[in-house]
Amino acid sequence: MKRLLWKSSLRHLQRHPLQLALAILGVALGVAVVVGIDVANGSALRAFELSTDTIAGKATHQIVGLDGVIPEGLYQQLRIDLGLRRVAPVVEGHAKLLRPDSPTFSIMGIDPFAEARFRNFTSSGPQGSLDLGIFLTLPGASLLAAEAASSLGIAPGDEFEIDIGGAVRTLVLVGHLPATDDAQLAAIRDLLVVDIATAQETLGLVGSLTRIDLIRPPAMTEAEFEESVAAILPPT
């Protein structure tokens, strides 16, 4: 019976070669689409992971508030009361540059002195060195990826305006974010870095942080570290 079915099918296909070709083409296109989707999903996931790793840096733990903010004093408590040194305060938000075709940028306010153990945003890179004094003292000082700044026509020393929920603020580009390869460049393309005081003022978060990054000391176990930090957290 099976042989008869095979012979019948073969005769049909021999009489209709175009149908056979279209069937094979359809299967090939279907496989190509599935493979293409898998590759695209893999690339998107990798880009997301890289972006997340770039922003989080080497942090092993993070403190975030239930309502999106935490009191700035908690950072001092972690450093003074617990004696932790690998702690970094962060203030985050979003804004659009008042430039044609500007994407939405993630604003990240940092403390350069606490950053070195977590991220390399304020280190010297191939695009040029950063004057840390200017970054900390010049009102509105900011950093962008060199590619993003170039595409928007912004050079170091230029002022530019950003829109945050309808409020316009003026910043000045004082340097470029370092990137060692294309993957890292892609992760920081839409990132705008300022010092933490500028971020707090610009985003209306004076006295508050959006998160605190921590690196567990090697001498403490995971449980010991989490218990000591939890002991000074405000009640929920």
What are these regions (language model features)?
Residues 1-236:
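Alpha-helical transmembrane segments of bacterial inner-membrane membrane proteins
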